[in-house]
């Protein structure tokens, strides 16, 4: 159950997901070098501010879709793509924090006993703000059975950029209900 040879579109591996969300080839480091990892997928080492898009939370503009259920006419399940203005990964990915935890291609253990668990990354709309660390590159990732439906899990589709081996995301997580 791995990527088909020559696939044009696919669910990214965990490594591909992390790099697309956290790695910045232009990050200026203290030692004068460039290229490195941001702690959070918003291109910084500052955590996300959970809440509805466009709202102030403790004096800061909300930057991630988790920690709220409803805000006026807006439901946490239907926040439009890109609603958190200016919040994106160094590669331009939108909404890597909140909305849905995203499946990756990586299978974990238990395969030889007839079932597998897949790695998921990021946070979802239903997460408590106390789990902010889950969006940190240093936290690791969760896992779940792909045969179970969770409204908090979705996926991101990636593609190979024509003429290079670099991956980009072309579609954002779709909630599996």
Region locations from a protein language model:
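A short, hydrophobic C-terminal helix/tail in secreted or cell-surface proteins
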Residues: 162-177
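Short, structured beta-strand segments at or near domain termini in extracellular proteins/domains
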Residues: 150-160
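Hydrophobic aliphatic residue packing
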Residues: 81, 161-162
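Functional-site microenvironments in short loops/helix caps that host divalent-cation chemistry
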Residues: 1-135
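Short proline/glycine-enriched turn/loop segments at secondary-structure junctions
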Residues: 110, 138-149
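Proline-rich low-complexity regions
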Residues: 12, 64, 146, 162-164
């Amino acid at each position: 159950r791995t990527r088909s040879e020559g696939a044009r579109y696919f669910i990214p591996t965990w490594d591909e997901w992390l790099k697309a969300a956290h790695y910045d080839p232009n990050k200026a480091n203290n030692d004068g070098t460039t290229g490195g990892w941001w702690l959070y997928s918003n291109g910084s080492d500052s955590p996300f501010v959970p809440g509805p898009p466009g709202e102030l939370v403790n004096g800061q503009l909300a930057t991630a879709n988790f920690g709220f259920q409803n805000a006026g006419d807006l439901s946490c399940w239907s926040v439009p793509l890109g609603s958190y203005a200016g919040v994106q990964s160094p590669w331009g990915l939108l909404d890597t924090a909140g909305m849905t935890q995203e499946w990756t291609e990586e299978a974990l253990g238990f395969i030889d006993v007839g079932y597998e668990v897949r790695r998921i990354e990021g946070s979802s709309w239903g997460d408590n703000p106390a789990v902010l660390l889950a969006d940190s590159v240093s936290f690791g990732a969760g896992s779940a059975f792909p045969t179970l439906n969770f409204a908090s899990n979705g996926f991101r589709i990636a593609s190979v950029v024509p003429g290079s081996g670099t991956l980009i995301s072309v579609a954002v997580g779709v909630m599996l209900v």
